Amino acid sequence: MNLRLCVQALLLLWLSLTAVCGVPLMLPPDGTGLEEGSMRYLVKPRTSRTGPGAWQGGRRKFRRQRPRLSHKGPMPF
């Protein structure tokens, strides 16, 4: 009778611990869930638009310049 009561108490303790933690305590974490350590690999930081990029200097070379409107005269329409 006493052994059965101890086994039931241990089982109840084990079930309550696994319900709180979500997984059994002896299993190592496999790393497939979203944890704080792996969140930084999922989200890329935003870069500034005006900062130097990998191809931004070459893009400036080939961009067509806007005409200056200060010396052009009246608009045609």
Curated annotation (Swiss-Prot):
Q: Does the keyword Secreted apply?
A: yes
UniProt superkingdom? Eukaryota
Give the disruption phenotype, in one or two sentences.
Mice heart of embryos show increased coronary vessel growth at 13.5 dpc and 15.5 dpc. Double knockout mice of APELA and APLN genes exhibit the same penetrance, embryonic lethality and cardiovascular malformations as single APELA knockout mice. Knockout mice do not show significant differences in their hypertrophic response compared to wild-type mice.
What are the recorded GO MF terms, alphabetically? apelin receptor binding; hormone activity; identical protein binding; signaling receptor binding
Where expressed (tissue)? Expressed in extraembryonic visceral endoderm and in the primitive streak at 6.5 and 7.5 dpc. Expressed in the anterior visceral yolk sac at 8.25 dpc. Expressed weakly in the embryonic heart at 11.5 dpc. Expressed in the adult heart. Expressed in endothelial cells and cardiomyocytes and weakly expressed in fibroblasts.
Task: Mark which residues the record calls propeptide.
Answer: 23-41
Relate the induction remark in this record: Not up-regulated following myocardial infarction (MI) (at protein level).
Keyword DNA-binding carried by entry: no
Keyword set for this entry? Angiogenesis, Cleavage on pair of basic residues, Developmental protein, Gastrulation, Hormone, Secreted, Signal
GO cellular component terms, A-Z? extracellular region; extracellular space; perinuclear region of cytoplasm
- Which residue windows does the record flag with biased composition (Basic residues)? 58-71
- Family assignment from sequence similarity: Belongs to the apelin family.
**Name of the protein this chain belongs to:** Apelin
Query: Organism source for this protein?
Result: Mus musculus
Q: Which gene encodes it?
A: Apln
